[in-house]
Amino acid sequence: MNDVLEILKSCDAFLEGHFLLSSGRHSSAYCQMAYLQQYPEKCAAAMKPVAEKLRELDVDVIVGPAMGGIVYAYELARQTGKRAIFTERVDNVMCLKRFAIHPGEKCIIAEDVVTTGISSLETKRVIEEAGGICLGITCVVDRTKPEAPSPIPILASALKLDLPNYAPEECPICKEGKLPLVHLGSRKMKQEAKQTL
């Protein structure tokens, strides 16, 4: 597991600093998984423990929600010999536009990072509407908390991280006043994060 964290750090996919999460909460760390996807060999190495667990399961299809899950679904399929497909948004609704799931096919959702598991519910709905069976989620990084587990079981992850996050008014980093708050998704995020260390 520490090997996976080192892989993420080696390609700047694991950032430390002061971050504004999409939930509005603050965190001292952030996983920018697109940076891992730049390096196929590192991505393959990070996904190896997930693929090993996946081989033990009776799975037909690995489904990656666009955008974050596409590469991971493909890599898991490559390592396990399964079929990979992806869901995508059309008019802001998650759907299966380019592929088909056959009734009764056993599906696994492949995600980059799972924090609450809520976003995977859309993909689960798509799988079930197509007649497939959603067995659970696999991910590179599992950030779920015991007090707030994912609504869909996480069957395998490459790395389990217990990263605290805070309401803005309770954030100890803000109270310290030393690190600027980095807004996620900005083009300067990686550079700002490095400057704050």
Segments and roles (model prediction):
Residues 1-197:
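PRPP-associated nucleotide enzymes
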